[in-house]
């Protein structure tokens, strides 16, 4: 990174920024959530709709958040502040509510996201120690019993592994934006790609893999419905970390010479490519060994260990696979944490070290532990009929993210207006900018409203 005249650091290159954003958006969205949703929703039909949705709503919204973030180059709250407009024009202070909603959504997702990271560490350690023995083929019952014993019924074990994951995040974040986040993604993202490509090559060459590839790539058009498309549109927000300040915060470190249109398109396509590769990593092996692809959220943790137990060097590939999941989770978690840390630093004039400790410990105590206990010792505790874990997921993903994203689109279309166009004026795509602006102003809010209403019912 370099430092500009406002003493705010900037990414050292577009590649560094794109790698960081890719890390922020890949996470469990591409490696865990995308594959099981494909399995539940018609295979190729879901993949096709996801690619369309990335163009319809994903890339336009990436550009929205990039414009907001780079405009003032501040935290995700002050990005909606009264100094956003040129010539001293003021705006309502209530727009900052969007920033606070984004922070609340970030807290909600991290409350359960870090727990999933703890699950992955648990599996890696169990594979290495032999507690999860896949040296010989295992049955569905064995895989389920292991999951129930070590994930479902061992809250203190998961609390320990989640804390371990938090500590790894702390080590990276404590080194700052330059020495921590930027440097880590330079190594972690290439490593993730190497692991991912290696697993894809291994699995698409299995006997019978073509059946899985066909399921994955050949759309069943009878499965495509308006309801499914609305659902997929909503999943793109999760996949791209839209609506809770991540892209606003990361783009605030972009220099003014960077082409925001290029970075938005590259970000969207990078996320899509990684998600699609994750499917190639999983579905051929499922069909090779006759495992149903519609296992839902437990697909990775219950079905895939069965697959690995049938493979030559299955333990090695299982460790690589869960290592890949851990890297994806880590590159996302450090950037979501950074949204809150940056806000605390700039809003409360808090030193970075104190902001990191407050953020990580606060989420661990108020979010991670309740989410873990909510599926065990506190399983009778419900919030609006949902477990604590599921409530965090629902409230952040279905309500807060959607409302914040809706507000961002309206903010750019009706408040920033010409200022948003000026932020893109250094590019040569004047026609595209006009189309994008009107699309964001009139079409995107309607799409988000439809998704939001659909999520509620």
Curated annotation (Swiss-Prot):
GO terms for molecular function: symporter activity. It is a multi-pass membrane protein. It is found in: Cell membrane. InterPro entries: Na/ntran_symport (IPR000175), SNS_sf (IPR037272), YocR/YhdH-like (IPR047218). GO terms for cellular component: plasma membrane. PROSITE patterns: NA_NEUROTRAN_SYMP_1, NA_NEUROTRAN_SYMP_3. Pfam families: SNF. Keywords: Cell membrane, Membrane, Symport, Transmembrane, Transmembrane helix, Transport. The chain crosses the membrane at residues 18-38, 44-64, 101-121, 158-178, 188-208, 228-248, 273-293, 294-314, 316-336, 355-375, 396-416, 433-453. Belongs to the sodium:neurotransmitter symporter (SNF) (TC 2.A.22) family. Putative sodium-dependent transporter. NCBIfam families: Na_transp. This is Uncharacterized sodium-dependent transporter HI_1690. It comes from Haemophilus influenzae (strain ATCC 51907 / DSM 11121 / KW20 / Rd).
């Amino acid at each position: 990174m370099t430092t500009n005249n406002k003493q705010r650091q900037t990414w050292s290159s577009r590649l560094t920024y794109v790698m960081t954003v890719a890390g922020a958006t890949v996470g469990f969205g591409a490696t865990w959530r995308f594959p099981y949703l494909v399995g539940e929703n018609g295979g190729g039909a879901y993949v096709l709709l996801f690619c369309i949705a990335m163009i319809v709503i994903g890339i336009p919204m990436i550009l929205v958040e990039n414009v907001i973030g780079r405009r003032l180059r501040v935290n995700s709250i002050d990005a909606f502040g009264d100094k956003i407009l040129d010539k001293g024009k003021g705006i309502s202070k209530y727009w900052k509510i969007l920033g606070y909603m984004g922070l609340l959504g970030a807290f909600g997702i991290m409350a359960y996201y870090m727990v999933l990271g703890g699950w992955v560490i648990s599996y890696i350690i169990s594979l290495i120690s032999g507690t999860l023995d896949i040296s010989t083929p295992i049955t569905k019952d064995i895989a389920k019993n292991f999951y129930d014993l070590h994930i479902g019924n061992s809250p203190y074990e998961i609390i320990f592994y989640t804390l371990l994951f938090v500590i790894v995040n702390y080590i990276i974040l404590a080194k700052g934006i330059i020495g921590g986040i930027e440097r880590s993604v330079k190594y972690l993202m290439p490593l993730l790609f190497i692991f991912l490509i290696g697993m894809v090559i291994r699995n698409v060459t299995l006997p019978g893999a073509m059946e899985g590839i066909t399921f994955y790539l050949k759309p069943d058009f009878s499965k495509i419905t308006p309801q499914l498309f609305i659902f997929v549109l909503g999943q793109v927000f999760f996949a791209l970390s839209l609506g809770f300040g991540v892209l606003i915060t990361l783009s605030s470190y972009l220099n003014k010479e960077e082409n925001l249109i290029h970075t938005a398109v590259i970000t969207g396509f990078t996320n899509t490519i990684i998600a699609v590769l994750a499917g190639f990593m999983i579905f051929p092996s499922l069909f090779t060994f006759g495992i149903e692809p519609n296992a839902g959220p437990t697909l990775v943790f219950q079905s895939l260990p069965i697959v690995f137990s049938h493979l030559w060097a299955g333990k090695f590939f299982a460790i690589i696979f869960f290592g890949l999941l851990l890297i994806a989770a880590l590159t996302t978690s450090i950037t979501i944490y950074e949204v809150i840390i940056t806000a605390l630093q700039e809003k409360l004039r808090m030193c970075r070290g104190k902001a990191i400790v407050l953020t990580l410990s606060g989420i661990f105590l108020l979010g991670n532990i309740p989410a873990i206990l909510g599926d065990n010792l506190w399983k009778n505790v419900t919030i609006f009929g949902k477990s604590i874990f599921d409530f965090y997921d629902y409230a952040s993903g279905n309500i807060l993210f959607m409302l914040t994203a809706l507000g961002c689109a309206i903010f750019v279309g009706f408040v920033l207006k010409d200022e948003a166009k000026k932020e893109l004026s250094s590019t040569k795509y004047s026609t595209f900018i006009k189309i994008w602006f009107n699309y964001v102003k009139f079409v995107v809010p309607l799409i988000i409203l439809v998704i939001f209403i659909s999520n509620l019912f």
